[in-house]
Amino acid sequence: MPTPYLSGSAVALVTPFKSDSSIDFEAIARLTEFHVAAGTNIIIPCGTTGESPTLAEEEQVAIIKTVVEAAQGKLMVAAGAGTNNTHHAVELAKNAEKAGAAAILSVAPYYNKPSQEGFYQHYRHIAEAVAVPIIIYNVPGRTGCNVAASTILRLARDFDNVLAVKEASENFTQISELLEERPSNFAVLTGEDSLILPFMAMGGNGVISVAANEIPAQIRQLVESAGSGDLVTARTLYSRYRKLLKLNFIESNPVPVKYALARMGMIEENYRLPLVPLSAESKRAMDEELTLLGLV
C-alpha cells in the first residue's frame, strides 16, 4: 500500500501565553522552528493541546498564520478547526484554509451526541466547504461519543479530501477495521502516545503526539522505527520515554506538557482558565523525570 499523504510524526502544538494571558507569538515561532529542526512531519496548532476552547477565532487565525510563516514550507501545517456546531465548524475550517493551513483537524461533535448519520452530515458539510485535506478527530474520552469505523470509512470513500483520522478511541477492534478497510490514500493516525509501538506494528501511519512538544526527534524516530519493523530500536525508545508519555497526562492535557516546556526554557508557564497549574506533587514527579532524561 502506498504511503498516505498525511503520515508520520505530527505534534499537537501547545499555545504559549504571556503572564497577562495574551498569546506569545514569538514563542510560537520558536517552537515551530524547533520542530522544523527536529524533522517533525506535521505541526498542528489550535487543537486540544493548544487550548482551542479558550481561543477566539481571530486568535486562531493569527496563530495559524504565525506557524505557517515560521514553518517556511519545511513541514506541513494542519490546523485544528473543529467544534460541535456544524455551521461554526465550517467557518473555522474556511478560516484555517485562508490562513494558509495545508490541512485541518476537525474534532467530532461533542456534548450534543449526534447519530452516525449526524456525524456523516457534519463532516460532509466541512468537506464540501474547503479544498484542503481533512483529518477526522475521534476522541470519545473527551467528546462522549464515538464516530464508528463504518462512518469514517464512508466519509473517506465519498470525499476526496477526507484523508485521515486521528483515532484516539483506544478501541483496537475499531482501529483494526479502519486499517483493514481504508482506501489506500487514507491515513490512520493514533492520538495516544502510549500506543505508538503497537499501533505502528498493526500498520498505522503515524501519531498526533503531545510528547512531540518535548521530544520531537525521538517521537519521529519511534514512529519511523516501529513503522519500518525495527522493533529493537522502537522498543528501546519506548522504554526510555514511557514514563514521560504517562506523566504528560498526570493531570489534564496540556497542563503537564506546558509545565515541562517551561522547565525546559521554551515557554512561560501560563494557562487560560479553567485550566490551572500542576499540583506540587505532579510538579515533583515531572521534575524528576525531566532531570533523569536530561531535558532540564
Curated annotation (Swiss-Prot):
Q: Which Pfam families match?
A: DHDPS (PF00701)
Listed under GO biological process in this entry are: diaminopimelate biosynthetic process; lysine biosynthetic process via diaminopimelate
The catalytic site is made up of 137 (proton donor/acceptor), 166 (schiff-base intermediate with substrate)
Q: Which residues bind pyruvate?
A: 49, 208
Q: Which CDD domains match?
A: DHDPS
Question: What's the superkingdom here?
Answer: Bacteria
Question: Which GO terms fall under molecular function for this chain's record?
Answer: 4-hydroxy-tetrahydrodipicolinate synthase activity
Residues of the site described as Part of a proton relay during catalysis = 48, 111
EC class of the enzyme, as a word: lyase
Write out the entry's keywords from A to Z.
Answer: Amino-acid biosynthesis, Cytoplasm, Diaminopimelate biosynthesis, Lyase, Lysine biosynthesis, Schiff base
Instruction: Please state the Enzyme Commission number of this protein.
Output: 4.3.3.7
Q: InterPro entries under this entry?
A: Aldolase_TIM, DapA, DapA-like, Schiff_base-form_aldolases_AS
Task: Kindly state the subunit structure of this protein.
Answer: Homotetramer; dimer of dimers.
Q: Which family does it belong to?
A: Belongs to the DapA family.
Under the heading NCBIfam families, the entry gives: dapA
The record's function comment reads:
Catalyzes the condensation of (S)-aspartate-beta-semialdehyde [(S)-ASA] and pyruvate to 4-hydroxy-tetrahydrodipicolinate (HTPA).
Q: Which HAMAP family match?
A: DapA
State what protein this is by name. Answer: 4-hydroxy-tetrahydrodipicolinate synthase
Protein source organism: Chlorobium chlorochromatii (strain CaD3)
The gene it comes from is: dapA
